[in-house]
A protein has these predicted regions:
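N-terminal Rossmann-like or analogous alpha/beta NTP/dinucleotide-binding catalytic cores
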Residues: 1-131, 230-241
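Glycine- and acidic
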Residues: 5-10, 37-42, 213-219, 434-435, ...
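Residue-level signal for inorganic ion chemistry
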Residues: 25, 56, 106, 110, ...
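Active-site cores that bind ATP or allylic diphosphates and position pyrophosphate for catalysis
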Residues: 105-248, 253-260, 268, 293, ...
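Catalytic adenosine-cofactor/nucleotide-binding cores of aminoacyl-tRNA synthetases and other
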Residues: 227, 239-395, 457-482
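Long, amphipathic alpha-helical coiled-coil segments characteristic
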Residues: 399-428, 433-434
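Helix-rich, typically C-terminal accessory recognition domains appended to large enzymatic cores
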Residues: 426-471
């Protein structure tokens, strides 16, 4: 059985690129009848952000990327774990001594060593190497310290880290599913720290141990990790672990061709949720940033993506995240929604704007929703588009001309006469109202509809006029005609 994982660090809110990584892991796992895990890699305690784990879980669930195993939230919103390979939070695994056991094994077998170099010495080496135009790397001073001497120094209270002992001048070769064959020589690599002075493992060590113990068969992650993969390959060999399949995904880029970043772009999943994007639309579009389905369809459900997904059709180069295209995809999903469901989603925006009350009649809310369903691409847009219904009309320049056509007074008079004949502007009355005005006034087409629309809405174009009449109602229409 294939087992894939999404293993973010809780250093901030879920990034749109992280969601795509999680999605690709999920799609492949589901297609192959496997499991999708969520593991939290919190070994860098200096960058830990309070609430980030909850955000990661919440946004994945909102997006429909459901976890089979690992970290989740219980019914009270508290962090919990499900599965037999836990703990799934690395800091909890540290407490169990999982990593130290394997680090000591590596030392005993000559694949790692204790390093006692101070931060000051390491900084001096780094600065000198930079000044000499060299790539900064550890100079190997402690490689020759025997295990016996090292343990004496540790017993005397010296601070230490554990480093990986790389062989010299050896090519490490691996096959990446997307990028192909990759070769990196150990002379271009560093003796990576495995266990830090605080006893916590580094990412590079913990990720190998955890992926092995959790039975992960495919490592699917961003291509920024390619340069680190040879270290991981060597660790798999040194520990006697079976190597998984590696899949490095192309970067998600902004329109300028640079990596989409939290600092310069709205790049958190929460940003898109709060801007009124539907989870189905965001997931649909995000899947297409770097992957092309065989069917060439642009609108795909999660189930359809599971059926069609293949790493063979993932691009080697970065995919551009185009917000305009996302808007188009989101609009397609809005158009397809049942009015009753869409009404529930737009209601909070209309209530917040003060346009409607919480206890609004369901039928009226659905009428308002239906009126703008074809024209909005994000949920909050309904506020600006419907503003003319609930506030004093702001007349556009083109509408001003229409409000001053020669026959405008005739139209006003005939509309008032027809209004006097009805008790209320219900759906049936609204649909027949303009036909009666047409017959009574003798005007039709643009000569009828554009001036009436200008009078009632301050615009010359807009949604179905019969819907507007029904929403405004008899009293408000009369007020606007005065």
């Amino acid at each position: 059985m294939v087992r894939l994982r999404f293993a973010p660090s809780p250093t901030g809110y879920l990034h749109i690129g992280g969601l795509r990584t999680a999605l690709y892991n999920y799609l492949y796992a589901k297609q192959k009848g496997g499991k999708f895990l969520l593991r939290i890699e919190d070994t860098d305690r200096t960058r830990y952000v309070e609430g980030a784990i909850e955000n990661l879980i919440h946004e994945l669930k909102w997006a429909g990327v459901e976890v089979d195993e690992g970290v989740c939230l219980d019914e009270n919103g508290k962090i919990t774990e499900v599965g037999e390979c836990g703990p799934y939070i690395q800091s909890e695994r540290v407490e169990k001594g999982i990593y130290n056991k394997y680090a000591e094994e590596l030392i005993e077998r000559g694949y790692a060593y204790y390093c006692f170099c101070s931060k000051e010495r390491l900084d001096d080496i780094k600065n000198q190497q930079k000044a000499d135009g060299k790539i900064p790397r550890y100079d190997g001073l402690c490689r020759g310290v025997s295990i016996e001497d090292a343990k004496k120094r540790i017993a005397n209270g010296e601070s230490y880290v554990i480093r990986l002992k790389l062989p010299e001048n050896r090519d490490i070769v691996f096959e990446d599913v997307i990028k192909g064959k990759i070769t990196i020589n150990t002379n271009d690599m560093d003796d990576q720290v495995l266990i830090k002075a605080d006893g916590f493992p580094t990412y590079h060590f913990a990720v190998v141990v955890d992926d092995h113990l959790m039975g992960i068969t495919h490592i699917v992650r961003g291509d920024e990790w390619i340069s680190s993969t040879p270290k991981h390959i060597y660790l798999y060999e040194a520990l006697g672990f079976e190597k998984p399949t590696f899949v490095h995904l192309p970067t998600v880029l902004n329109k300028s061709g640079k990596k989409l970043s939290m600092r310069n772009d709205d790049a958190s999943v929460e940003d898109f949720r709060l801007k009124g994007y539907l989870p189905e639309a965001l997931i649909n579009y995000l899947a297409l940033v770097g992957w092309s389905p065989e069917s060439n369809e642009e609108i795909l459900s999660l189930d359809e993506m599971v059926k069609q997904f293949s790493f063979d059709r993932v691009s080697k180069s970065g995919g551009v995240f185009d917000v305009d295209k996302l808007d188009w995809v989101n609009a397609q999903y809005i158009r397809k929604m049942e009015v009753s469901e869409l009404a529930k989603l737009v209601k909070p925006y209309l209530v917040k704007a003060g346009f409607i009350k919480e206890d609004i009649c369901e039928k009226r809310l659905e009428l308002i929703t239906k009126t703008f369903q074809e024209s909005i691409s994000r949920l909050p847009e309904i506020v600006e588009q419907s503003r003319f219904l609930f506030e004093n009309v702001v007349v556009e320049p083109d509408a001003l001309k229409m409000r001053n056509v020669e026959h405008i007074e005739i139209l006003k008079e005939k509309m008032k006469e027809e209004l006097s004949q009805i008790e209320e502007m219900d759906e049936e009355t609204a649909k027949g109202f303009m036909k009666k005005v047409q017959k009574a006034s003798g005007f039709k087409g643009k000569d009828l509809y554009m001036p009436v629309r200008a009078l009632l809405t301050g615009q010359v174009h807009g949604p179905e006029l019969s819907n507007i009449l029904e929403i405004l109602g008899k009293g408000e229409i009369l007020r606007r005609l005065e």
